[in-house]
Regions:
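Class I S-adenosyl-L-methionine-dependent methyltransferase catalytic core
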Residues: 1-106, 110-181
């Protein structure tokens, strides 16, 4: 068990994180085949999930976002449903792993896909409350220098073109406490 958990989970509609980190996971010996890692990665499109089942597990905020995405891109909506269900599981697991009076700190940002606003922070806050966290503190932080491109083109693809729409211009630090039973 832990007194403090600090994490910055992947963002929905972002990169496939297992692919992005394949070199380091192979080099450090975490897995022999990075494709295995894909199956356990938050929101990965490479492991089976039942869309209808995901919809039934989604929180109200997650369901609202997925429904909006479904109108513009069904495959992204399905991926987002898996991501949000995974994040709900992450907050529950974090709560279970904390000692009483322990804290969990998440760093996450909101994004947009084809003009659908994706409020990851709001979904995470709802998930943390649902998992049992209390006294949530939300800190909004402007991102001034981001190494990975913060822009998307009209098709929703990442680009380095500064005339494109900026995403990930701010992030949220969300801190929750687990009180004694």
């Amino acid at each position: 068990f832990a007194d403090l958990i600090v994490t910055s989970p992947p963002y929905v509609t972002s990169y496939e994180y297992a692919d992005l980190h394949q070199l380091s996971t192979l080099w450090l010996g975490f897995v022999d085949d990075y494709k295995i890692l894909r199956k356990g990665t938050i929101g990965s499109i490479y492991h089976e999930s039942d869309y209808e089942d995901n919809l039934n597990q989604l929180s109200p905020i997650g369901l609202d976002i997925v429904s909006s995405l479904y109108k513009v891109d069904k495959s992204k909506a399905k991926a987002a449903s898996k991501y949000f269900v995974d994040m709900q599981k992450v907050t529950s697991k974090a709560f279970q792993l904390l000692n009483n009076n322990g804290y969990s700190l998440f760093v996450i940002g909101n994004t947009e896909y084809k003009k659908v606003k994706i409020d990851n922070a709001k979904h995470l806050i709802e998930s943390m409350y649902s998992a049992g966290f209390r006294d949530l503190e939300i800190i909004q932080r402007k991102i001034s220098k981001k190494i990975l491109t913060p822009y998307r083109d009209s098709r929703g693809k990442f680009t380095s073109n500064k005339n494109s729409r900026q995403v990930y211009s701010e992030e949220f630090i969300i801190i929750g406490k687990k009180y004694e039973d």
